[in-house]
């Protein structure tokens, strides 16, 4: 499913500078549009993106070799239909708020050109989301795709652009880099008016260091505490669902599970019952060496099913295995299982009590708590 590419191939700094100029001109025209015109464009683009959710998902998985088609369909659907419904009635043009008592008015104006850095983990859904919110706010946007996901990312952008232009948007309001590189991305971030950066820690840091306003979405490392008052079946099922959705590539998915020692065996048995695999000691060391290589997450495990990750480590497990679980003790950076893994690999810790569990979670990042109503939810909030 390829749309017609009517723009000049952007594969050099000179062509990127020309693209920036074209998008700026289109944005100046778009800035004059009324709310009614903008909403018509926003709706048409969202409908087009949603209609393409299935082929875009297939294209993303085929190109990147990561994730699950069915789950990427859901993500594309969410990025298109949910985002549209969430913002369709939001005023983004002209006076959006007025206080006659104080003689104040709040006026919405576009920022200009948005630099949108797109990750390989969620290429099409992220491109859909960022292009739609730029259309809703009358901003121009230039997409910098990940080299491993450029085909699917650009295709998503084309679909949104063509629908938007057909509905009345200026030609060239959405642009993209056809041959992405670090130099091109850095130039785009320096020249744009604001940056929406989604990616690894290095990319997000570069966005924040560019000298331009930036909103970064970087790595997560969410631990989950399963308290002794928790509904064990619910907690375990929720974690498995999170870790297997798109093969664990959602940054908010649990990376570690911290279990109260009173229910540790019951929780472990529930994971086993639901098709997870607990690594033996020698297997644990093999998988450790596969998770982190040269101080960074091994790209070969990202978005892969559990059995393939085990095979990379030289461990044989059933192909039906849902999640690889490593029982570990250290929450220090030296423990590979304590890192974000972006795959169906989970660290599992035993806690002596709730305070010990909370302490471990704080060392990792924050925490998600499975508990029955109790004073403990208040101690987490503190």
In which residue ranges do the predicted regions lie?
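N-terminal Rossmann-like NAD(P)+-binding subdomain of aldehyde/semialdehyde dehydrogenases
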Residues: 1-105, 133, 273
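ALDH superfamily catalytic-core signature
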Residues: 10-13, 204-332, 359
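Conserved glycine-rich beta-strand-loop-beta hairpin in the small C-terminal domain of fold type I
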Residues: 338-345, 365-369
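Hydrophobic alpha-helical bundle architecture
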Residues: 358, 362-372
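Residue-level signal for inorganic ion chemistry
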Residues: 138, 195, 260, 309, ...
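Short, well-ordered beta-strand elements within core beta-sheets of diverse protein domains
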Residues: 25-32, 115-116, 256-259, 342-352, ...
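Single conserved hydrophobic/aromatic residue that forms the stacking wall/gate
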Residues: 370-381
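Rossmann-like NAD(P) dinucleotide-binding subdomain of oxidoreductase/dehydrogenase enzymes
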Residues: 95-234
């Amino acid at each position: 499913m390829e749309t017609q590419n009517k723009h000049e191939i952007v594969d050099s700094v000179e062509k990127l500078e020309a693209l920036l100029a074209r998008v700026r001109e289109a944005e100046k025209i778009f800035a004059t549009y009324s709310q009614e015109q903008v909403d018509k464009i926003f709706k048409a683009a969202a409908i087009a993106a949603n209609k393409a959710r299935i082929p875009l998902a297939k294209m993303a998985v085929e190109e990147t070799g990561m994730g699950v088609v069915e789950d990427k369909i859901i993500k594309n659907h969410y990025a298109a239909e949910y985002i549209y419904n969430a913002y369709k009635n939001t005023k983004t043009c002209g006076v959006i708020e007025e206080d006659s008592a104080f003689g104040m008015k709040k006026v919405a104006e576009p920022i200009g050109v948005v630099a949108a850095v797109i990750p390989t983990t969620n290429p099409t859904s992220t491109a859909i989301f960022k292009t739609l919110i730029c259309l809703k706010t009358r901003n121009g946007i230039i997409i910098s795709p990940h080299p491993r996901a450029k085909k699917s990312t650009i295709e998503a952008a084309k679909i949104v652009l063509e629908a938007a232009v057909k509905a009345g948007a200026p030609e060239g309001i959405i642009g993209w880099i056809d041959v992405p590189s670090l130099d091109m991305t850095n130039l785009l971030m320096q020249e744009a008016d604001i940056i929406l950066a989604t990616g690894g820690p290095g990319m997000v840091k570069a966005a924040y260091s560019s000298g331009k306003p930036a909103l970064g979405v970087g790595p997560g490392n969410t631990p989950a505490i399963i308290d002794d008052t928790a509904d064990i079946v619910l907690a375990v099922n929720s974690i498995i669902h999170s870790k297997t959705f798109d093969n664990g590539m959602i940054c908010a998915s649990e990376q570690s599970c911290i279990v109260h020692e009173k229910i540790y065996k019951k929780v472990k048995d529930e994971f086993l019952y639901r098709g997870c695999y607990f690594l033996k000691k020698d297997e644990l060391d093999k998988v450790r060496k596969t998770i982190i290589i040269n101080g960074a997450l091994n790209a070969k495990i990202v978005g892969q099913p559990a059995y393939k990750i085990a095979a990379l480590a030289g461990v044989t497990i059933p192909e039906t295995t849902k999640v690889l679980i490593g029982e570990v003790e250290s929450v220090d950076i030296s423990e590979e299982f304590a890192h974000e893994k972006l795959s169906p690999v989970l660290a599992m810790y035993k806690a002596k009590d709730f305070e010990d569990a909370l302490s471990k979670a704080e060392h990792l990042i924050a925490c998600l708590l499975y508990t029955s109503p109790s004073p403990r939810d208040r101690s987490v909030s503190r």
